[in-house]
Swiss-Prot record:
InterPro entries: ICL/PEPM, Isocitrate_lyase, Isocitrate_lyase_ph_CS, Pyrv/PenolPyrv_kinase-like_dom, Pyrv_kinase-like_dom_sf
Subcellular location: Glyoxysome
Species: Komagataella pastoris
Main location: other
Binding locations of substrate: S103, G104, W105, G214, H215, R250, N434, L435, S436, P437, S438, T468
Active site: C213 (proton acceptor)
GO CC aspect terms: glyoxysome
Subunit structure: Homotetramer.
Protein name: Isocitrate lyase
One MF term in the entry's GO annotations: metal ion binding
UniProt keyword annotations, A-Z: Glyoxylate bypass, Glyoxysome, Lyase, Magnesium, Metal-binding, Peroxisome, Tricarboxylic acid cycle
NCBIfam families: isocit_lyase
Chain's gene name: ICL1
Record SUPFAM superfamilies: Phosphoenolpyruvate/pyruvate domain (SSF51621)
GO biological process, one term: glyoxylate cycle
Length: 550
């Protein structure tokens, strides 16, 4: 065939294709993937990869994280960390903590690529958090690793034994929010995270357009299967780009109150409906009131009045109430037990099936309308809770490495219940826990309980725990205190409360020129000029010589 095409060796093309399929199958047969479910095969991935492909550098970090979490799970301990904002944070964190977190909340408030701050609504450009990851790992973690490596390998092995060593390449887990769009957006976002250096990402089951911080009200969930599709998209993207990326499935269902759709029967048990057949739909009441010129507080009062009359309940509550009132059902507890045996939070029974069973038990239908209470944005009312979170976590677990229930308070018993509910279903999944600064820790528990909380959670299987906004608060506290004292006592505040404390605690940033890499860059300069440079930054006369004894 002639024409404006490139000649290709078909036999080699086919051989390369088959070899890649075999390589993928061998990859997937490793213990790493023992608990991972895929809905596609190796051929599906191989045919969609580029002819020019390579394993990303971040894959080493993903493998490192997987091994680390496995060790913590075996030892019933936890990797506990907090969200980093700046390279200064990661260099100090790396000395003590074995993972790093990158928070979407912190990025939203301080690092949006739109340069417009916002609360945690995930309304920033989708490259915001990946860019923060790149700034922290590709541009900073690697730099400090190179700097340390040059310093250590410039002396003998015996001398290196006396030098402190820090693993600056701590694996990063980053916040993917709800994925910033549909399936293709999630595939692209995952690729961004892999390319920028993330070892893992977490994604939550809220609706993207109404996403809220896990500790805000008004959270809207997507159906169970829709979030599973997101998790599959993450793994598909990671497979396409040859990454062992760790996937964390978060559910916000413990405190959620709304649902986008009733398409998934696993959600039906938790959908709220009206049990009063004599009231109009809420949206009709509100629309009519708006046409009459009512707004604001008047509409809120109308909705509250409507809700009181509607008899809002879950379907099983309506059935139990009907059983209690029924004169034809003699053994009421037996009737309830019969219904509960097939209709429960974890049975996945559809509303249609539940209604059929209720009619069989009662001899008549139980009125229940989940369309009537829909809110003006079109969402269904939903009653979440721990059981709901367990149901969702179980559904997500085959497609994720860790599952995480966002919670309202640091309730240890709730953590026990969730862990038991998930572990009963799957022994293989690790759990994650948000040690949120949104909690009032001093109201929630005593200082002694605070000290042991991480360890107690670790024994339950919460092998990765994190404080989302610790550096936001610690930075504010430190700068506020220093500013206050600086205003009062001038340079004494810096000399005594900062510099002297840095020296006392051995914090290397007291020599900030060295910390920033001045000696390392001098070495590169001398390397390219034959070992001599009159413009070396750390040469004779450098001010930092004043700290040579520290």
């Amino acid at each position: 065939m002639s024409g404006p095409y490139t000649k290709i060796d078909l036999d080699k093309e086919e051989q390369d294709f088959q070899n890649q399929i075999k390589e993928i199958e061998e990859w997937w047969s490793q213990p790493r993937w023992a608990k991972t479910k895929r809905i596609y095969n190796a051929e599906d991935i191989a045919k969609r990869r580029s002819s020019l492909s390579s394993v990303p550098a971040s894959n080493q970090q993903a493998q490192k994280l997987f091994k680390l979490l496995g060790e913590h799970a075996k030892n019933e301990t936890a990797s506990f960390t907090f969200g980093a904002l700046d390279p200064i944070h990661i260099t100090q964190m790396a000395k003590y903590l074995d993972t790093i977190y990158v928070s979407g909340w912190q990025c939203s408030s301080t690092a949006s690529t739109s340069n417009e701050p916002s609360p945690d609504l995930a309304d920033y450009p989708m490259d915001t958090v990946p860019n923060k990851v790149e700034r922290l790992i590709l541009r900073r973690q690697l730099f400090h690793d190179r700097k340390q490596r040059e310093e250590r390998l410039s002396v003998s092995k015996q001398e290196r034994a006396k030098l402190p060593y820090t693993d600056f390449l701590r694996p990063i887990i980053a916040d993917a929010d709800t994925g910033h769009g549909g399936i293709t957006a999630i595939i692209k976002l995952t690729k961004m995270f892999i390319e920028r250096g993330a070892a893992g990402i977490h994604i939550e089951d809220q609706a993207p357009g109404t996403k809220k911080c896990g500790h805000m009200a008004g959270k809207v969930l997507v159906p169970v299967q829709e979030h599973i599709n997101r998790l599959v998209a993450i793994r598909t993207s990671a497979d396409l780009f040859q990454s062992d990326l760790i996937a964390v499935a978060r559910t916000d269902s413990e405190a959620a109150t709304l649902l986008t759709s009733t398409i998934d029967k696993r959600d039906h048990y938790f959908v709220i409906g009206a049990t009063n057949p004599d009231i109009p739909d809420l949206i009709d009441v509100l629309t009519e009131a708006e046409l009459q010129g009512k707004y604001g507080a008047e509409l809120s009062q109308l909705e509250a009045d409507w809700s009181k009359k509607a008899g809002l309940k879950l379907y099983h509550e309506a059935v139990f109430e009907a059983i209690d009132k029924s004169s034809s059902v003699k053994d009421k507890q037996a009737a309830k037990d019969k219904f509960s045996a097939k209709v429960g939070p974890l049975t996945g029974t559809s509303h249609k099936e539940a209604a059929k069973l209720a009619k069989e038990i009662l001899g008549e239908e139980v009125f229940f309308d989940w369309e009537a209470p829909k809110v003006r944005e079109g969402y269904y009312r939903y009653q979440g809770g721990t059981e709901c979170a367990i149901m969702r976590a179980r559904a997500y677990s085959p497609y994720a490495d860790l599952v995480w229930m966002e919670s309202k308070v640091p309730d240890y018993q709730e953590a026990v219940d969730f862990a038991k509910g998930v572990k009963t279903f799957t022994q293989t999944n690790w759990l994650a826990y948000n040690l949120s600064p949104s909690f009032n820790w001093n109201k929630a528990m005593s200082p002694d309980e605070q000290e042991t909380y991480i360890k107690r959670l670790g024994k339950l299987g919460y092998n990765w725990q994190f404080i989302t906004l610790a550096v936001l608060h610690t930075t504010a506290l430190a700068v506020d205190n220093f500013s206050r004292d600086y205003q009062k006592i001038g340079m004494k505040a810096y000399g005594q409360q900062v510099q002297a404390k840095e020296i006392e605690d051995g914090i290397e940033i007291v020599k900030h020129q060295k910390w920033s890499g001045a000696e390392y860059i001098d070495g590169l300069l001398k390397l390219t000029t034959g070992g001599l440079s009159s413009t070396a930054a750390m040469g004779a006369g450098v001010t930092e010589d004043q700290f040579k004894d520290h």
